[in-house]
């Protein structure tokens, strides 16, 4: 009996100990995030309020301004917004057709041994950090763009679009290819039985049936193109 009571006390103690430990860990995480948010908002909102080192600043000028020189009190992010939109649109216009055709090739056209090699390679590319894509763009793409660009450094929107296109391709391909493979086999068999060719079946039956997955892949690609700042900074 005494031994059982001792074991029960140990269990209760350990349970309370870990409960308190996990609670402290959760509180630490919440407080850390809250402090980060307060710091970011404090620094970000400082120019819009009087009696600070930056002085007052108009929110409309902040959104529409085309000049970013904090040293002189100019905080316009309009050109950043425009550049982000143009770079994302360019990457989507170039990347989506390539990703769509690549997904069709992996899911429907390529022999199974080849598809089993290409599919993991695409998934591996999707896991590469953005900083590595940025280094690749800086070392490879920027010098290539430099040869056709009027800017001596090679820094241009074209280089950014090229890097973002390469970045979003694996993400879109992985999602779209999975959606294509999820289309029921009966759809394909029915189309072929009606006399359609394989390509007609793919583009008129399979792709429309997988349109929700295709849209999801495009949205994820857009999200990554907009959110990946490190690669753009390096390029």
Regions found by a protein language model. Give the residues of each.
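Transmembrane alpha-helices
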Residues: 175-176, 198-234
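Periplasmic/extracellular loop-to-transmembrane helix junction in inner-membrane transport proteins
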Residues: 5-16, 42-91, 111-112
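Glycine/proline-centered hinge or cleavage motifs at structural transition points of membrane proteins
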Residues: 129, 194-195, 208
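Generic hydrophobic transmembrane alpha-helix motif, especially the helices
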Residues: 123-168
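Hydrophobic positions within alpha-helical transmembrane segments of bacterial inner-membrane proteins
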Residues: 31, 84, 88, 92-100, ...
């Amino acid at each position: 009996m005494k031994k059982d009571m001792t074991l029960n006390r140990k269990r209760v103690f350990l349970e309370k100990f870990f409960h308190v430990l996990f609670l402290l860990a959760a509180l630490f995480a919440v407080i850390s995030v809250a402090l980060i948010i307060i710091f970011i908002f404090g620094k970000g909102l400082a120019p819009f309020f009087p009696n600070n080192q930056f002085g007052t600043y108009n929110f409309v000028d902040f959104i529409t301004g085309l000049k970013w020189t904090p040293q002189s009190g100019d905080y316009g992010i309009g050109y950043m917004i425009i550049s982000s939109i143009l770079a994302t649109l360019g990457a989507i216009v170039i990347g989506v057709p390539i990703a769509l055709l690549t997904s069709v090739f992996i899911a429907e056209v390529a022999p199974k041994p080849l598809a089993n090699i290409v599919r993991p390679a695409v998934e591996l590319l999707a896991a590469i950090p953005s900083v590595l894509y940025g280094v690749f763009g800086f070392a490879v793409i920027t010098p290539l763009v430099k040869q056709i660009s009027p800017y001596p450094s090679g820094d241009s929107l074209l280089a950014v679009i090229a890097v973002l296109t390469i970045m979003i391709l694996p993400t879109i391909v992985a999602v779209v290819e999975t959606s294509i493979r999820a289309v029921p086999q009966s759809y394909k068999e029915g189309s072929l039985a009606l006399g359609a060719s394989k390509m007609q079946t793919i583009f008129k039956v399979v792709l429309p049936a997988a349109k929700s997955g295709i849209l999801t892949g495009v949205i994820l690609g857009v999200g990554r193109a907009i959110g990946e700042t490190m690669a753009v900074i390096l390029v």
